[in-house]
Design a protein with these regions (language model features):
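Non-catalytic accessory/assembly modules
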Residues: 110-117, 124, 130-138, 185, ...
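Bacterial peptidoglycan biogenesis and beta-lactam-recognition machinery
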Residues: 49-53, 103, 107-108, 190-192, ...
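Non-catalytic, conformational "gating/processing" segments within enzyme and secreted inhibitor domains
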Residues: 116, 165-201
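Short pre-active-site segment immediately N-terminal to the catalytic Zn-binding motif
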Residues: 29-38
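Hydrophobic face of alpha-helices
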Residues: 41, 57, 61, 95, ...
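Non-catalytic beta-strand/loop surface segments
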Residues: 1-30, 54-90, 126-180, 204-251
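Active-site SXXK
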Residues: 38-52
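M16/insulysin-pitrilysin zinc metalloprotease superfamily fold
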Residues: 51-54, 85-116, 251-254
Length: 256
């Protein structure tokens, strides 16, 4: 079902256990970022847990835990996803929290600066100080020509030192909207009732005009092999990756 404000809702009943999984997918990721602003989407994912006008910083995770649930999030090249696993009876409370932060995010400059230190350390641990992280980053740089496809999801270190809190606020204001999201719910729920609950909680959030996304299919096809070699001081063990460029799934975004 699609609400008047553009939010697409998918509900799948599964009554094998009294639990439910909620996922909200935002159609925004590293492919949408401009050169010099890499890591925007991933940084905003971190800040989405820093509170709203009604839910203080850190309270989101505490409330999910209090309900006996688990939650997390991830950022990819094409999407940013937030998900929770809870007792089915507590699903409405989870949806209320997600609806709130879809349009009421409110973080301070101080929280932003603190979190950027965390993100820079995350990059050091996952990319700078690991051979496989460095290998995959170099593989994308070699395989693609468009900056949007080459960019690191977590962001390049130089960009992580120059991103501003207002960059993230503008990103949030533009892309976190019901008409740029898909809500997926699977579990021990009644589909009709769940759709009604979601419509009540998300239905009044206004839609926002969305700019066209980067056209990934315009990436030129390479008909010759590309080889890249890199060294890393953290290991003497050789790592090898063989990657193949394959055709896209036609209109996958439209299908979703």
């Amino acid at each position: 079902e699609t609400l008047p404000n553009g939010l697409k809702i998918i509900v799948k009943e599964d009554h094998r256990a009294p639990v439910a999984v909620s996922q909200i997918w935002y159609k925004i990721g590293s492919v949408d970022e401009k050169p010099g602003k890499s890591g925007l989407s991933h940084a905003l994912e971190h800040m989405m847990f820093k509170g709203t006008k009604d839910v203080p910083s850190g309270e989101f995770n505490r409330r999910v835990s209090e309900l006996g649930g688990q939650n997390n999030a991830y950022t990819n090249r094409n999407e940013t996803v937030y998900y929770e696993n809870v007792a089915a009876a507590n699903l409405p409370e989870i949806l209320k929290l997600e609806a709130d932060r879809m349009h009421n995010l409110n973080f301070s400059d101080k929280e932003f600066l603190n979190e950027m230190n965390v993100i820079r350390e995350e990059r050091r641990q996952r990319t700078e100080d690991t051979a496989d992280g460095k290998m995959w980053e170099q593989a994308y740089l070699a395989a693609f020509t468009q900056p949007s496809m080459r960019a690191s999801v977590i962001g390049y270190m130089k960009d992580l030192h120059t991103l501003k809190a207002d960059d993230l606020r503008a990103w949030y204001k533009q892309y976190y909207a019901p008409n740029n999201a898909v809500l997926v719910i699977v579990g021990d729920v009644d589909a009709k009732q769940t759709l009604q609950t979601a419509a009540k909680l998300f239905g009044d959030i206004p839609a926002k005009a969305q700019p066209p996304r980067n056209k990934l299919h315009t990436e030129p096809y390479l008909r010759k092999p590309v080889t890249v070699k890199a060294t890393s001081p953290v290991t003497h063990q050789p790592l090898i990756a063989i990657n193949f460029r394959v055709p896209k799934l036609q209109k996958l975004d439209d299908t979703m």
